[in-house]
């Protein structure tokens, strides 16, 4: 890699809901677009429109009435490799870069199956002819972006949540916990509440409207039961929301009922621990000597940790679970919605000490895709 130090690596973070991509060394991603691929429902329907066999991202979103939308990444893990033309779109259309000229840093969900990591490596080197690549765990990058190398990351995005303890830059795989509860479930839960109360009726195509409502109006109550009582007595929690057709609806207790599901999954019929207990359980799976460092560095990451009030509530809940003498600190970086882990990737790929960690094409040719498990150690 020594000869290519003036070439900026590409950093691509593929989330369940959004792709964030750009150049290492930049302080924000150049491209942020939905992780969706759409294919025409009927060939020939779009005559005269220069019909493509597939549309990606915002273009797919805008044509959603006449194409079938697919999310190739489910619960943070690639489930449909045919639809990963998202990478082609990212490099050539969004970044206007030739991947054969740039090293590429990809991100992956914690506990990503080994076969998936190998497939990502193979596609990058054999299909895109990249000179070098690396796969890093998303939560590790979020921690780097917060200026830490030790801590526990609660990463909750659109499709999945994880708690990932990290010690001196390395994820501790035995203590990573996954929770199949995230933003999409909260949006669906809010749709259900609104429909039950006949506030409005939605189909999947209009899920985007409810997602927007959730992002603009939902918040986490410090004390859920007390907030319910307050909502019954006073209209202070009520807010108006204007639908695209101009109709105005009022939502009250739904604003904090929606994200309460993160702490109480039983509200939507899920038998699992909430995000606070999952964080605590992850810490308890770690060596007793490092727990203090983890309790003092709980870092929130991902769009589903953006609700006002979530950091205070996490702090309160974990304080109740932890030993009484333990100092608890919950950190909520302001850029965590889209770009914190992308920034972590940008920092990592720019470090001079990282340059010998890339998997080069030569190493791949010698060892095959399994080299990813030997070289990508920061990926847990």
From Swiss-Prot:
Lineage top rank: taxon: Eukaryota
Species, as recorded: Daucus carota (Wild carrot)
Cellular component GO terms, alphabetical: cytoplasm; cytoskeleton
Stored InterPro entries: Actin, Actin/actin-like_CS, Actin_CS, ATPase_NBD
Function of the protein: Actins are highly conserved proteins that are involved in various types of cell motility and are ubiquitously expressed in all eukaryotic cells. Essential component of cell cytoskeleton; plays an important role in cytoplasmic streaming, cell shape determination, cell division, organelle movement and extension growth.
Protein name: Actin-1
Gene Ontology molecular function: ATP binding; hydrolase activity
Catalytic reactions on record: ATP + H2O = ADP + phosphate + H(+)
SMART domains to which the protein is assigned, alphabetical: ACTIN
Entry coiled-coil feature ranges: none
UniProt-listed Enzyme Commission number(s): 3.6.4.-
Subcellular location: Cytoplasm, Cytoskeleton
Source organism phylogeny: Eukaryota, Viridiplantae, Streptophyta, Embryophyta, Tracheophyta
Keywords: ATP-binding, Cytoplasm, Cytoskeleton, Hydrolase, Nucleotide-binding
Similarity comment: family membership: Belongs to the actin family.
Pfam family, any one: Actin
Primary location group: cytoplasm
């Amino acid at each position: 890699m020594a000869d290519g130090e003036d070439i900026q690596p590409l950093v691509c973070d593929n989330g369940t809901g959004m792709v964030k991509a750009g150049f290492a060394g930049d302080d924000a991603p150049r491209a942020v677009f939905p992780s969706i691929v759409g294919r025409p429902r009927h060939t020939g329907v779009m005559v005269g429109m220069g019909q493509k066999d597939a549309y990606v991202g915002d273009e797919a979103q805008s044509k959603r009435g006449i194409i079938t939308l697919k999310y190739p990444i489910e619960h943070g893990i690639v489930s449909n490799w045919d639809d990963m033309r998202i990478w082609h779109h990212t490099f050539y259309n969004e970044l206007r870069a030739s991947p054969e000229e740039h090293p590429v840093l990809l991100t992956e969900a914690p506990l990503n199956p080994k076969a998936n990591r190998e497939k990502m490596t193979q596609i990058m080197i054999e299909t895109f002819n990249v000179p070098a690549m690396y796969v890093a765990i998303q939560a590790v990058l979020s921690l780097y972006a917060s200026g830490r190398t030790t801590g526990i990351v609660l990463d909750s995005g659109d499709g999945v949540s994880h708690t990932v303890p990290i010690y001196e830059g390395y994820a501790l795989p035995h203590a990573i916990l996954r929770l199949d509860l995230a933003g999409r479930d909260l949006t669906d839960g809010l749709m259900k509440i609104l429909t039950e109360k006949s506030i409005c009726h939605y189909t999947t195509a209009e899920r985007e409207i409810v997602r927007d409502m959730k992002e603009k109006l939902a918040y986490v109550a410090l004390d859920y039961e007390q907030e319910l009582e307050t909502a019954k007595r006073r209209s202070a929690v009520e807010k108006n929301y204007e639908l695209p057709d101009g109709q105005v609806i009022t939502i009250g207790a739904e604003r904090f009922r929606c994200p309460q599901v993160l702490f109480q999954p039983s509200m939507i019929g899920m038998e699992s621990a909430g995000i606070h207990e999952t964080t605590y359980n992850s810490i308890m799976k770690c060596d007793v000597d490092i727990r203090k460092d983890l309790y003092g560095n709980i870092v929130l990451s991902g769009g589903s940790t953006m609700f006002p009030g979530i950091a205070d509530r996490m702090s309160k809940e974990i304080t109740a679970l932890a030993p009484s003498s333990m100092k608890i600190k919950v950190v909520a970086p302001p850029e965590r919605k889209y770009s914190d882990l992308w920034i972590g990737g940008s920092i990592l790929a720019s470090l001079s000490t990282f340059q010998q960690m890339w998997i080069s094409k030569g190493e791949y040719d010698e060892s095959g895709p399994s080299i990813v498990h030997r070289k990508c150690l920061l990926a847990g």
